[in-house]
A protein has these predicted regions:
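Phosphopantetheine-dependent thiolation modules in NRPS/PKS and related acyl-activating systems
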Residues: 1-41, 46-77
């Protein structure tokens, strides 16, 4: 799951995946802006065949938060 997630993030933010970890956030990744965040949400929803609800999107402050949401949705890929 992490590898696939990191590949999507790398593609959306146009950064090397070596710059991405669970602590990656808008504070330490310049490319993470509001537009790219919504592109990222869409890409993840399509790749993992899921939908984020509004509260989930508001909870996401760093990459590790996606994994918590995946657990809630029982996504283990």
């Amino acid at each position: 799951m992490s590898e696939k997630l990191y590949q999507i993030i790398s593609k959306v933010f146009n950064v090397d995946d070596s710059k991405i970890n669970d602590e990656t956030s808008p504070e330490n990744l310049e490319e993470w802006d509001s537009f790219n965040f919504y592109v990222l949400l869409d890409e993840i929803e399509n790749e993992f065949n899921m939908k984020f609800d509004l509260n989930e999107t508001l909870e996401i402050k760093k990459i590790g938060d996606f994994k918590k949401i995946f657990q809630k949705h029982r996504i283990n890929e």
